[in-house]
A protein has these predicted regions:
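Non-catalytic accessory segments flanking enzymatic or RNA/DNA-binding domains
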Residues: 1-101
Length: 101
């Protein structure tokens, strides 16, 4: 599964796409060190799918140095929030929505 994490820190919009075999366990580990971030969406996906998401994030955002997170514009953040993983894979079903701000 690939998943979309989102975090809004003041005026900074942070997003991360990762991959995990056990989504609930991965989300629980995030709550420990980043309790304000939400796991917005997930869908079936491979290492290749995760890489494709990272490539798209490189085009629309700026990677935080030494981090798995990207800073994106308000417009991109809103689109990611609305579409979830569908932002990256518009024809891929099912897209699961997990948490909301």
């Amino acid at each position: 599964m690939v998943y979309l994490m989102m975090d809004k820190r003041g005026s900074m919009n942070l997003v991360k796409v990762g991959r995990a075999s056990h989504i609930p366990q991965r989300r629980a580990s995030y709550r420990t060190h980043n309790p304000l971030a939400i796991m917005r969406s997930n869908c079936a996906g491979t290492v290749k799918a995760e890489k494709e998401c990272h490539e798209k994030l490189n085009k629309v955002g700026k990677r935080v140095p030494r981090s798995e997170w990207w800073i994106v514009s308000d417009e991109v953040f809103a689109s990611l929030y609305e579409k979830g993983m569908g932002y990256f894979f518009p024809n891929h079903l099912p897209i699961h929505f997990c948490e909301e701000f």
